[in-house]
Amino acid sequence: GPMVFKGYWNLPEDTAYTFRGGWHHTGDLGRFDEDGFLWYEGRKAEKELIKPGGENVYPAEVERAILEHPAVDQTVVFGVPDPTWKEGIKAVCILKEGHELDHRELIAFVSQHIASYKKPRYVDFVDEFPLLEDGSPDRAKIKELYGGPQE
């Protein structure tokens, strides 16, 4: 509330958009599991929205599908330039120790769990992610490292 946060400095439009109807709309997504626990699922921020062929795809949904694969330990999903779809979906993944997987296998697996237009078109496998101070993946740095033109 206003005792903690009055708004964004010199950004009245952003402040008005974020504070609506007496609520602070953070853009955080969550879900309740069958035991009633609330799980953080990512952000529903416009800047994270990927639009392949004009469709709306949230990275958190694609990440959940990828993490269902038994060989995948961590993943970060983001949009990249794509010659066909204007924006393509890219996944950067860390595999669990002792597991092997190629991009075709992962894309086929994900296609069984989410709509075809939401599956990643590009996949990179890496050994580690750059991390933020809190230990979470540094999404901006990962996109900077792996988000250039795709082949």
Predicted regions and their residues:
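A structural signal for the hydrophobic beta-strands that form the central parallel beta-sheet
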Residues: H25-T26, Y40, F125
